[in-house]
Structure formats: structure tokens, C-alpha cells
Amino acid sequence: MKHLTEMVRQHKAGKTNGIYAVCSAHPLVLEAAIRYASANQTPLLIEATSNQVDQFGGYTGMTPADFRGFVCQLADSLNFPQDALILGGDHLGPNRWQNLPAAQAMANADDLIKSYVAAGFKKIHLDCSMSCQDDPIPLTDDIVAERAARLAKVAEETCLEHFGEADLEYVIGTEVPVPGGAHETLSELAVTTPDAARATLEAHRHAFEKQGLNAIWPRIIALVVQPGVEFDHTNVIDYQPAKATXLSQMXENYETLIFEAHSTDYQTPQSLRQLVIDHFAILKVGPALTFALREALFSLAAIEEELVPAKACSGLRQVLENVMLDRPEYWQSHYHGDGNARRLARGYSYSDRVRYYWPDSQIDDAFAHLVRNLADSPIPLPLISQYLPLQYVKVRSGELQPTPRELIINHIQDILAQYHTACEGQ
């Protein structure tokens, strides 16, 4: 399992390649990603965050072992080789337990790391940047690094115990955007300074030395930084290479290190490619994939309304709206404004808080009903042209079967294709 180390080596040798990380637990998104990687014969990096998946189940109800089992079962069913599958853990640290005293939060973080590593996750993002209940705000680089080193030691010991070798690849760094997109309207974003990036690296190197972990430094493959990309509900801050030049050049001084960029969702294909060229060679994508899923489902729901009598329709959109209103905890603190603004945000926001609701049984039943209604007879081509024009072109050329499921998968794969092209290298 050296796909990432090899990618970094090639990038450092001038290939300007990279890898994208699929950050989603939705079965259709994962199927789209696995099938796309299979067709293009590339490894696939799938990541779970500490919010989604933890030793207690996270918000998905899955432990790391459950998540691995779920992904591997899907990969097997699609004949995707498990040795081409890389599993990553994102923001692993005390993130979920910031309301607890630091000692308790870090004890939970130790167990979190053990559970991810024991389950076979090989890319580990150590993130101890968040202040706990009795911590100063913000934490110093030294405290953050000491906590990360403590977790790295736990990870190494767990890996040796379970697999007989220490082959983990680490990502460190703390200057990340708000996970899942910013809450507020944005206009401009500060790029991580080279000095801040160097300070993070040096603090971590020193802390790792104190833990006797010098030998793992070459396996610290990436530093999370902010290259100046972000999105809010209706806007995207596009990558501006000139603002990140000094940061980009800094990466060239490190033999085995590249940068990891979070919240790259909705960047243009040109910006994604330039990010990789500028050494932001691990691109995280999540909400953009579930946004594409939601687009396809809304389009199919509109087609259904044209074809099926109202009383027999799935009512997917209304079911979704009702469930989101009944259980507002995933969007209420994110979406602001009057009733209409919040209604639009629930359905269409780039931050895609609707992704938290797809597992709901009522919504899942409505989804299954929608697919059944549209699978009974062929969808008329003019309606595919009206509501899914990019897929229509592929249907007409014979590349794509016009079934509901294939239309959804292909629409998600249009986003994956942008990331694949950005990461291909020379």
C-alpha cells in the first residue's frame, strides 16, 4: 500500500500528478467513484471524517471497521481490487469532543486512532488544532504538535500490533477551512503564509523527535494548508495562483512533502489542475459529489412529475423538505435569512447540508419509489435532454444507458472526471 508515497515521489520528480480524495459515505457516490477508478485503472482514495465515523459510530452510525467493510463489500461487488483502494481518516483528533476537558478528549482521540488504524485505514490526518473545554484559544503550535505526536505514536503501535509492519502515511496541519464549507458569506480568503506552514512543520518535527518518531518523518506525506479556495452557500472563491506563489514554492524545499487542499469543491477544472501543478497535490472533494447526486435526483423528480400521475409520484422533493423541517439540526445553524432564503438553501446551497438527510428511511423510501417509477418504461429522450442535457449527449452517442441509476452515477462521474484530469500529471 504505497500508492501515496509513490505519487509524492513522482510529483517531486516533476510529473505534476496528484490524487483526489472522495469524502463521502453515500453508496451512490462511492459506486460512481469506484466504477470511475476501475474504468480508468487508477487507485482510489476514499476518506471518512471523524464526524462521520468513529469508535462510537459517528453521525453515519458506522465505526471505522464498519465503514471499511461497507466500502470493501461495494468494491468487491464491482470487481475493484482492494489493493487499489486506499482508506483515509480525516481530522482525526479531539474534534468530536471539544466540549470535554483536554485529558478526556485526548483519551477518546487515542481510541479513535486505534479504531481507524486497526480497521486498515492507511492515510491518517492528525488534527489536534481544536481547543477543548479547559484549553486556551487558540492552541499554540507546540501543544497542537505534541498532541499529534502522541496520536502518531498510538497509530504506529496499533499498526505494528495488527499488521506486523508500520506502513501508515500521515497528513498533518491545522489551517483548514470550516469542514463542509463556510457558514458565512465570503469575499476573500487568507492564504496560509510560508512562515505559518514552516512553523507547523517544525513544531511537528520537534514533537515527533521527542516521542522517538524520527523514522516516520518520510511517511508524513502532506501538510494541510489553505491555498485560498472555499465556498459558501451560493459563491465560490476561486484559486488565485499568484496569491499562493510563495506557499507553493516553499513545498519545493521538502523532499517528501506536498500540500493537501480541503474544500476544493466547485473549483473550475482549470483551477483544480493549477492547484496540483502548484503542489497542492491531494485534492479533497465531498459536497460537490453529493451536490451532483442531488442535482440528478431533482432532475429525475421533475421528469417523474411529467410522466407519472400526481397520486403515484414519489414526492421526493416534498418528503425531503418535510424531513429537513422536522429535523433541522443539520442545517439550522448554517442557513440564515428569511423563510424563502432558507428554503432555497435547503435545496440548493453549495454547502449541501441536505447530504446529511439521504440515509433517512422516509427519504430513502421516496428515492426507491422514484427509481421504480422511472424504471418501468424508458425515459423519453426529450425529457432527458431537458433535465439532464450532459447525460443526454452520452445517451444519444450510445455511451450511457438511460436508466435512473445510470443517469445519477454518470452525473456524479462528470465531477470525478474533472478531478481525475487535474491529477493525471504529465
Swiss-Prot record:
Signal peptide: none annotated. GO terms for cellular component: plasma membrane. SUPFAM superfamilies: Aldolase (SSF51569). Coiled coil: none annotated. Pathway: Carbohydrate metabolism; D-tagatose 6-phosphate degradation; D-glyceraldehyde 3-phosphate and glycerone phosphate from D-tagatose 6-phosphate: step 2/2. Gene3D superfamilies: Aldolase class I, putative tagatose 6-phosphate kinase domain like. One of its GO terms (biological process) is carbohydrate metabolic process. It comes from the Bacteria. It holds the Pfam family GatZ_KbaZ-like. PANTHER family: D-TAGATOSE-1,6-BISPHOSPHATE ALDOLASE SUBUNIT KBAZ (PTHR32502:SF2), N-ACETYLGALACTOSAMINE PERMEASE II COMPONENT-RELATED (PTHR32502). Belongs to the GatZ/KbaZ family. KbaZ subfamily. Component of the tagatose-1,6-bisphosphate aldolase KbaYZ that is required for full activity and stability of the Y subunit. Could have a chaperone-like function for the proper and stable folding of KbaY. When expressed alone, KbaZ does not show any aldolase activity. Forms a complex with KbaY. This is D-tagatose-1,6-bisphosphate aldolase subunit KbaZ.
